[in-house]
Amino acid sequence: MGNLGIFDTAKEAVAAAAAAQKEFVKNYGLDDRERFIAQIRKELQPRIEEFAKLEYEETGYGRIEDKIGKDTGAIMLSPGTEAVPTGVIASEKGLTVEYYAPFGVIGAVTPVTNPIATIIANTICMLAGGNTVVFNAHPASIRCATAAVQGVNQAIVNAGGPENICTMPAHPTMETLDDIMFAPEVKLLVGTGGPGMVKTLMSAGKKVVAAGPGNPPSIIDETADLKKAAAGVLASATFDNNLLCIAEKKFL
């Protein structure tokens, strides 16, 4: 039995997410998804400082004050059902309604650098599309991942939704990742991490959405306000001690 999405094995976590996804698409509509997301934001916003302190305590990375800002963005600004478009095509033959269907169960890998923000943001976006997700968290952030998964699931249940919209094995390893990647129920893989992680996910032969190495350049040319550019680069590159892969790493 799971404990708000936490299971002893990856196979149990996958099975629970698969069962939840079937119930999700059968019994709940777009308005329900909006309600679940609103409840996640409502219940987790007051816990942002708690989450930030937990991340720093467990991983030893970054700065608490910056994690507060990062987790706030993940909880309050991650896109929901408004990002799921629908359309109607009219012709002499009638009307055709176009809408996006869910993948089903998604397998996701999360990093030690952004353990709580990644899980919450991923789950909001994925459930907006009618999916459920099985996370394989970084082993150095198990407490963070557990808090995020349980917090999200509790909010959804409190809003009248199904259990196990997001799940994870209690003790994630490379072996549990294999169990998730190659599970027939898992139709899409999502990864946040480095090039090795991307290569591993690609080996499953499934659709993959993954972020590889982050080395973004900044171009500062003759039209730039140098003082403003320097201040912006400094603020970005020092945010959370430069943990974010999107922060400036080199300059042209």
Could you say what each language-model-derived stretch is?
Residues 1-97:
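N-terminal Rossmann-like NAD(P)+-binding subdomain of aldehyde/semialdehyde dehydrogenases
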Residues 4-5, 198-252:
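ALDH superfamily catalytic-core signature
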Residues 27-41, 173-189, 196, 200, ...:
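Aldehyde/semialdehyde dehydrogenase
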Residues 84-155, 159, 204-208, 215-216, ...:
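Conserved small-residue-rich beta-alpha loop and adjacent elements
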Residues 85-98, 166-187:
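A structured beta-alpha segment of the ubiquitous adenosine-cofactor-binding alpha/beta core
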Residues 135, 168-170, 190-193, 208-212:
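General beta-strand structural signal in soluble alpha/beta enzymes
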